[in-house]
Amino acid sequence: MTKGILGRKIGMTQVFAENGELIPVTVIEATPNVVLQKKTTETDGYNAIQLGFEDKREKLANKPEQGHVAKASTAPKRFIREIRDADVDGLEVGQEVKVEVFAAGETVDVTGISKGKGFQGAIKRHGQSRGPMSHGSRYHRRPGSMGPVAPNRVFKGKKLAGRMGGDQITIQNLEIVQVDVERNLLLIKGNVPGAKKSLVVVQGAVKASK
């Protein structure tokens, strides 16, 4: 069984461990989430809970949305996400999920949308090496070989210039350094994907070392 919560990335800071070690942490604000729906193997083919995060104005929600959240006796939500393989029996529709479901020392997987970088070349986008910049070379930052003559086409998957960033990224096995229940904050060791104020999903690690 896994557990999870939705939150917003606030930024990064540093905290000191008891042994004096300086730990870089990402601060995530996870105000109480509301369980909007429970999905079970019998009705949906899999187990999951649907969480709603951050209220939005009533007039921004259509009729189906309003009816959906009314079953949980809550306001329409800006973000709705599913947590797969959650403890369906231990939660009820309308119940709040808070940061205290996690504890310091646990490992989690954090999912977010990476920062958009716009249209970038093969060097920045794929880490390709550039060519010589002088001595008569005319190959500097180009993508390189497009393949042999015979196929008369460029193979799918060729690493070329294009839009970079804005992808869903999951970083696994990050350690929770501190849980601030009063301020609804999670301090997670290291960096997590996304810009400041972006939505992140924090779930129990699926590959945690036992």
Curated annotation (Swiss-Prot):
Residues 119-151 are annotated as: Disordered. Keywords: Ribonucleoprotein, Ribosomal protein, RNA-binding, rRNA-binding. The keyword Ribosomal protein applies. Pfam families: Ribosomal_L3 (PF00297). PROSITE patterns: RIBOSOMAL_L3. One of its GO terms (biological process) is translation. GO terms for cellular component: cytosolic large ribosomal subunit. InterPro entries: Ribosomal_uL3, Ribosomal_uL3_bac/org-type, Ribosomal_uL3_CS, Transl_B-barrel_sf. GO terms for molecular function: rRNA binding; structural constituent of ribosome. SUPFAM superfamilies: Translation proteins. The keyword RNA-binding applies. One of the primary rRNA binding proteins, it binds directly near the 3'-end of the 23S rRNA, where it nucleates assembly of the 50S subunit. Belongs to the universal ribosomal protein uL3 family. Part of the 50S ribosomal subunit. Forms a cluster with proteins L14 and L19. This is Large ribosomal subunit protein uL3.
